[in-house]
């Protein structure tokens, strides 16, 4: 089941310097809620700066959905402290509001009460809001208020020089991209280990279903909670943030050019379903266009190849220009046991697993096999902790006990951990020891622990209690890396940058839209 990685691990042990200089970044989403857990109806706090142009504090789909973005960092503890500083500063600016500590929202009334994120009057700001209007009309606003954590990861040039024989990023872009696509294919095959260990959405509030049809055999309790007894991450299920209409796009992850061609095809393919929604209601735009994807970012994926874009450049054009620069892992639920939604154990595990995904052999993957991997993920998402659970590989019918596959994987990860730790540390090895125990004892997983708490206190009760505890904790902690002055200066500067964008616009919004894929 697990590919034989022994040769690659032996190579890694002989090249420990190849892993010096791993770079990471984190994006964390969280809903602003009132003291009684209702979605905040206030605008994005002005004191936090302009969501359009702030480097670290922005919004995602909704005006009440905060997103915190760290700079790229070579040190996990430093990275998490930076993220915590942003949380501390924000907690002090939110007045009586709190940050919801769970991926799944709970006390949301009518979908029409969810206000879309606003970014000012510039063309790009209006474009971003219209894109969200399209998402709302296509998939419903409720689904878009589900929050998660994204982990961005890149290996140093020294790794690619030693592993793939490249000299520099420019001349080696094809080889480096091929290495990252190998990582992505292995992620699709084995990444279900992430929701198994860290999924933290085994239950939803009954209100979340709001008349939506579901074939899932939910159990309900007297606290208005629907749950599956062995589920790990309903956020990643069809109930959560996925997109069924995209499953037949045929996008594959075998090489840069076919991947980009698939993406470009999807943003140019008309959709009858979305055409039926209409483009406009009178003068009001309803979506950017009626294609399968309005823009490339609409493609739902548990992992994405990325390159930082230049002004006016699409994500796929950036990839064609420079190859894959880093990958974005998108399968992490909010960690409810951390005030900042993610912790060092998770970050170190992802380092280990993503390195393993690059080292392990990864045969090319057809779009059919990609759909088959979804079945394995679904099994873990909906009943990953079920006693005796088995797991397959791609479209192959043979299955092995999940417990065995997990432990086999950790045998490999332990060797990667020893290389990362070197002689002076045991941090990565400790992560292996802590997490491998979850395969013998599923009650140690995030989903089992949070489900137990939710059965006792209800989802709303648990969410509110944690939100209040973290609010108090973060409000009272001093900043460690940033200063109040730096943060308020960035806030003020972001408003100046937004205003400059608004003054610079020469085109009407209709002209701008026509140039950027609008209809």
UniProtKB/Swiss-Prot annotation:
GO terms for molecular function: ATP binding; glutamate-cysteine ligase activity; metal ion binding. The keyword Nucleotide-binding applies. One of its GO terms (biological process) is glutathione biosynthetic process. InterPro entries: Gln_synth/guanido_kin_cat_dom, Glu_cys_ligase, Glut_cys_ligase. Pfam families: Glu_cys_ligase. Disulfide bonds: none annotated. Keywords: ATP-binding, Glutathione biosynthesis, Ligase, Nucleotide-binding. One of its GO terms (cellular component) is cytosol. Pathway: Sulfur metabolism; glutathione biosynthesis; glutathione from L-cysteine and L-glutamate: step 1/2. Its EC number is 6.3.2.2. It catalyses: L-cysteine + L-glutamate + ATP = gamma-L-glutamyl-L-cysteine + ADP + phosphate + H(+). Belongs to the glutamate--cysteine ligase type 1 family. Type 1 subfamily. This is Glutamate--cysteine ligase. It comes from Yersinia enterocolitica serotype O:8 / biotype 1B (strain NCTC 13174 / 8081). The gene is gshA.
């Amino acid at each position: 089941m697990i590919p034989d990685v022994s040769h690659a691990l032996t190579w890694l042990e002989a090249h420990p310097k190849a892993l010096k200089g791993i770079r990471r970044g984190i994006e964390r989403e969280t809903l602003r809620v009132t003291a009684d857990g209702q979605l905040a109806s206030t605008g994005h706090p002005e004191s936090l700066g302009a969501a359009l142009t702030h480097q670290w504090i922005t919004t995602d789909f909704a005006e009440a959905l905060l997103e915190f973005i760290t700079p790229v960092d070579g040190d996990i503890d430093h990275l998490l402290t930076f993220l915590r500083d942003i949380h501390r500063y924000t907690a002090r600016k939110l007045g009586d509001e709190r940050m919801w500590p769970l991926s799944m929202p709970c006390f949301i009334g009518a979908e029409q009460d969810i206000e879309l994120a606003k970014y000012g009057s510039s063309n790009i700001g209006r474009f971003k809001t219209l894109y969200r209007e399209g998402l709302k009309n296509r998939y419903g606003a409720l689904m878009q208020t589900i929050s998660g954590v994204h982990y961005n990861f890149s290996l140093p040039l020294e790794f690619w020089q030693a592993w793939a024989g490249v000299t520099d990023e420019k001349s080696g872009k094809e080889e480096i991209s091929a290495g990252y696509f190998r990582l992505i294919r292995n992620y699709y095959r084995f990444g279900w280990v992430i929701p198994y260990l860290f999924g933290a959405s085994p239950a939803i509030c009954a209100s979340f279903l709001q008349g939506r049809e579901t074939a899932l055999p939910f159990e309900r309790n007297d606290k208005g909670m629907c749950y599956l007894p062995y589920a790990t991450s309903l956020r990643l299920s069809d109930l959560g943030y996925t997109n069924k209409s995209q499953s037949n796009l045929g996008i594959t992850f075998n090489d840069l050019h076919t991947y980009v061609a698939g993406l470009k095809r999807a943003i140019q393919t008309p959709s009858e379903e979305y055409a039926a929604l209409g483009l406009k209601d009178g003068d009001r735009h309803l979506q950017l266009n009626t294609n399968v994807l309005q823009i490339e970012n609409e493609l739902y994926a548990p992992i994405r190849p990325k390159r930082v874009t230049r002004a006016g450049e699409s994500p796929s054009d950036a990839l064609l220009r420079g190859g894959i620069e880093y990958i974005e892992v998108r399968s992490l639920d909010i960690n409810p046991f951390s005030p900042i939604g993610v912790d060092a154990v998770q970050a170190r595990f992802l380092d280990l697993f993503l390195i393993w995904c690059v080292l392990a052999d990864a045969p090319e993957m057809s779009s059919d096999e990609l759909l088959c991997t979804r079945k394995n993920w679904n099994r873990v998402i909906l009943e990953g902790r079920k006693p005796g659970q088995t797991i397959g590989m791609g479209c192959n019918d043979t299955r092995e006990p999940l417990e065995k596959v997990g432990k086999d994987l950790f045998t490999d990860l332990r060797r990667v951990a020893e290389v990362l730790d070197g002689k002076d540390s045991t941090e990565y090895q400790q992560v292996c020891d802590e997490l491998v125990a979850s395969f013998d004892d599923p009650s140690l997983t995030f989903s089992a622990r949070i489900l137990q708490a939710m059965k006792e206190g209800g989802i709303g009760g648990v969410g509110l209690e944690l939100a209040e505890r973290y609010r108090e904790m973060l409000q009272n902690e001093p900043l460690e890396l940033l200063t109040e002055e730096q943060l308020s200066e960035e806030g003020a500067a972001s408003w100046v940058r937004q205003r400059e964008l608004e003054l610079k616009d020469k085109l009407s919004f209709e002209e701008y839209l026509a140039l950027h894929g609008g209809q």
